[in-house]
Curated annotation (Swiss-Prot):
Pfam families: eIF3a_PCI_TPR-like, PCI. Component of the eukaryotic translation initiation factor 3 (eIF-3) complex. The eIF-3 complex interacts with pix. GO terms for biological process: formation of cytoplasmic translation initiation complex; regulation of translational initiation; translation reinitiation. It comes from the Eukaryota. It is found in: Cytoplasm. This is Eukaryotic translation initiation factor 3 subunit A. The gene is eIF3a. GO terms for molecular function: mRNA binding; translation initiation factor activity. It comes from Drosophila simulans. The modification Phosphoserine is found at S908. Belongs to the eIF-3 subunit A family.
Amino acid sequence: MARYTQRPENALKRANEFIEVGKPLRALDTLQEVFRNKRWNYAYSETVIEPLMFKYLYLCVELKKSHIAKEGLFQYRNMFQLVNVNSLENVIRGYLKMAEEHTEAAQAQSSAAVAVLELDDLDNIATPESILMSAVCGEDAQDRSDRTILLPWVKFLWESYCQCLELLRVNTHCEALYHDIARMAFQFCLKYNRKSEFRRLCDKLRKHLEDICKSSNQTTGVSINKVETQQLCLDTRLYLLDSAIQMELWQEAYKAIEDIHGLMALSKKTPVPKTMANYYQKLAMVFSKAGNQLFHAAALLKLFQLTRELKKNLTKDDLQRMAAHVLLATLSIPLPSAHPEFDRFIEADKSPLEKAQKLAVLLGLPQPPTRVSLIREVVRLNVPQLVSEDFRNLYNWLEVDFNPLNLCKRIQSIVDFIENGPENALLTPYIQSLKDVTIMRLIRQISQVYESIKFQRLLQLASFCNIFELEKLLVESVRHNDMQIRIDHQKNSIYFGTDLTESQREYRPDGPALQSMPSEQIRSQLVNMSTVLTRAVSIVYPNRERDQRAKLRNQMVSQYHEIKDREHQRILQRQKIIEDRKEYIEKQNNAREEEEARRQEEESRKAKLAEQKRLEQEQEERERKRHQNEIQAIREKSLKEKVQQISQTAHGKKMLSKLDEEGIKKLDAEQIAKRESEELQREAKELQSKLKSQEKKIDYFERAKRLEEIPLFEKYLAEKQVKDKEFWEATEKTRIENAIAERKDAVAQQERLKRMYPDRDEFLEALKKERASLYVEKLKKFEAALEAERKKRLADRIVRRREERRQAFLREKEEERLRKEEEIRLAQAAEERAAAEARRLEREAEDEKRRAQYEKQRAKEEEAERKIKEDRDRLSRELASERERTEKERDTWRPRGGDRPSASAGGSSEWRRAAPAVSERNDRGGERIERGGDRVERGGERIERGGERIERGGDRDRKDNEGADSSWRVRREPDTQRAAAPKDSGAPQSRDDKWRRGGERDRDFRNDGARRDRDDGPRRDRDDGPRRDRDDERGGFRRNDGPRRTDEPQRETGGNWRDAPRHADRENRRPAGERRDRDVRETRGDQRGSAPKEAASGGGGGNWRNAPATREEKPAAKRDQAQEKENKAGDDGEWTSVKRR
């Protein structure tokens, strides 16, 4: 079964309970179970986990369990390094603080223990045990105490630092904390003098830096390319360098210098001058401790240059002090060996040249410095002129003047000046090197003056050197083959340059020199001879060389003219090749960069895919764990409920008391139930056995024993009662005696105090008299002040009450005014509401009246439309019957005319006499048509005089009956018949005149409609949409009659009208609006009594249709006039209601 896991807050409470009962290990196990479960990573925030973590680390520190603390810290980092970095920082700092406090307490305890041991016995300080321990182990009491008490805590603190550094080394959010902990670790090593731990710490930090540099191209983690990271690493290495110098670990200091130089070279930003000055200062110190005087002087020179150029507030004394330091360090450099190539025979990892080149890189020099180059640089910077007179003389004596007899004496004066001057404390380490350089200068200068010299004489000249040191220097000079020296101990002499065949190099002295050595002169004899002979030849033949030069010049010029074109082409070709090569290289580089970019993109894509896959796997793993945790929680809950249920019974408590927590966690619900049943059975068996044993004991023997015990118990109780009475009486007697004695003492005390009564009474009387006079004075003052205050308050109250009454009066007056204004306002508002209500009722009445008029008008319009429709149907039927009759009559007279193509006059008269009958019938039919048209037109007039919607209704009616209108209206005569019409007829003389008159009528009609539609008052409830009868595309009364009907009878004389050509009718056709206006005009003209049209003479032409129709004058009906007035009146007042509806 899975292990039981508590919630974090419950685990914290349980851990506190274990700590209170003195079980910290059990408390740590309880908290560790929570961390190992990992369930809290996804369910709780840092506010819940942080107290738990502090308690967990506290227990780890108390129990010195650094590995357990590391596990918890790593779990906490994984949870909160991206969520709440401050919480992680607080936890780590708190952990380290607790470890440091315990370590300091252990140190204090160790010192106290040693002090106690030392002060234990002053008469016997050296005990036999201490003597034996010191002889065996070689340690004192303090060392042994530290090893026993302090060392475990030091080890724990060191492990804590290492764990925190390992924890934070790849977290970009905790870089500052990482470097702070590194500095704390350096301080730890300094405080407890842990050199081996300091070396391991340096190696660890260097390894971390290498890992950062290797993984700098990754998208996550710490990147060395960031400026902040570089600065933090640089500051940490500078602190490491200071700590290494303090602990005198020069190898670690040199490695730190290499790291610092690498970081400064990697940074794109130039380090600040302060950092560079600190770097050069520490570098010079490391070189000095390493015994490398050459690079020590070079570092000081770089520091001097930097300070002189960038420090603006540099005083003259500081500049002189720094210049003296640089000059003395440079002059203290040992004279270089003439044959450093001997070092190549010594097996080493790196040659001296490579080492020197590496050190020069640390100083930012292009090549390793030499003593000569440094002295030249010192002179260039005018350093000898900046120092004091003594140091300037030192430079001249060593590097300029040639005076071997007084050299050591002069240098000894400078040495004494340095040793005696307190301000020259920094220059004291250079004294021995300066003496060695002086001795070497002395030997070289002596070798140029003497061939041999006595040892004693040389010792006199070298005043600060003994015979052994001098001999050692001589041997070193010979060893490096710098000089030819032979020591003759038998004669106690020294010989210089006696062998003239041993000069193997060109001697170039770097200091003051008088002449060359004899061996050097022999070696350069041929060279000198060549030089002298060349000079002699130039003097004997002064023009030979000039002629040779001119001849050589002419040859060169001629040769140049011969090859200049070829060389020019070659140069151009070479330039072209170079350009092509550059283009090729550039293309190769571009291709390589593109390939690299593609490769990096592919790697990045693969990395993203891998990261995505990893995240998916982690998500799946989390889901799986969460599912397992849920199942585990359910099981644990059921187990907990089962345990609680069992613990409520006596046998269950007994069964659980036999099991510890680990045992309970290992069991499941079934096993616990099984244990419970077993416990019940066992208790039942024990109860049965107890009952059986009791049955055996309850017998007569037991009763007899108890009967015998009764007298004994009675006797014991009687004796005990007597003893208790005696004890009470004695105690009571003692109490009474004590009370009597106390009363006697009290009475005696009272008698002694009674003698003080007179004095007491006198004192009280005097005190009362004094206080009474003071009381009377104060009472009078109080009463006077009270009376004044009472008068003042009465006056103030009078004034205040007057003001209150005045304010009350003004307030009542103002309230009365406001009340009256409010009444007036309410009355006005009531009147306005009544007026508004009356206006509203009036408007409603008017609206109702308009609505009734509109309904009445609408009923009239519907009646007119119904009549128009009935007339149209009737006219259509009459026209159809008339057409049939016309067809029949045409068929009757046409054959008769055809039988007599050349008839006589009488026959012609007979044929013509038949026409009037037809004409009469036609006239009657035309009269009916005209009457029908009159009715239709009158109906149209009524519709047109109506409102806007009525006009549109009439227009729609005319459009719908387009065919019928064209059938019953009076036909237009041909042009020839109109021309033959009588002059006195009322018909128009021509088609143009007729059209013009129709247009005037149409314009009048539109103007009349515009006057009727004008609204002289305000328009209410009006829809301002576009009016269909005023459309800009159709005009006021324009209508589209469409194509003419093809079944319309033809106007030509003779023949069938169906066979007539259409183009003739199309040419004579007029616009529909014009034809309508003409028909209206003709109809109204007939009503006004105009004369009917008459045919011209001889106009019959054999076709009865060409005869003019006879029209009768019809007076206008009074009913129609009255209806027209009523419609017009209704239209003037109620057009808005019609439009709205």
